[in-house]
Amino acid sequence: MSKVYLVRHGQTAWNVGEIFRGRADIPLDETGKQEVHLAGEALKDETLHAVYSSPLSRSMETAENIAKFHKIPVTPFDPIIDISYGEWEGLENQVVKEKYPELHALWQREPHKIKFPGGESLDEVRSRTIKGLEDLLAKHKDENFVLVAHRVPNKVICCALLGLDNSHFWRIQQDTASTNLFIHRNGQWIIAFLNDTSYLKSLGKPSLSDF
């Protein structure tokens, strides 16, 4: 049996400003730094054998706040890097609505049918993240590990492990610094919990939109 903790990075200024992040290397803001410290504390008593992170700094800093309690290194893991938004990267959501009205509407309505201009599709993200997860399961047989990634990869992984296709993307919530727990036993996935942020209550921050 293996436990896989899937964590989203902490808050950045671009989350608050509803700016498409993707491969842009945006650091955590002060709230994000507080969030990831609490996320790390929430997992400090768990038995963890490895911590993997998207190579982007917002995820790496989140992962380091988890790994430090277990005295294990953080391993950058390219398969879980954020989606490439291509031409949308660095643009505010409202700007994208105005510049790409039909494509933005399709993204909101049928996200599985869109490929971002100069970027990726959800199917491409699913292919690389699930292949990466399978490789780690083979490497860490009967061990527990953490993956720290981003909103889109996390939602796609959750859909896959729930047996859902990518059309269900918007039905999965992934708040900043949230944790999901999946248990792999006898070749099957068991979902223990999704989008846990109970450890962030002390911050008293308002909920952001799904961005």
Stretch-by-stretch model annotation:
Residues 5, 75-77, 192:
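General small-molecule cofactor/ligand-binding pocket signal
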Residues 60, 131-190:
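Active-site-adjacent alpha-helix immediately C-terminal to a catalytic or transition-state-stabilizing loop
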Residues 2, 47-49, 141-145:
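Short coil/turn segments at beta-strand junctions that form active-site/ligand-binding loops
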Residues 5-62, 69, 115-130:
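Loop-to-helix element that buttresses phosphate recognition and phosphoryl-transfer chemistry
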Residues 19, 79-80, 109-114:
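Short linear capping/connector segments at secondary-structure termini
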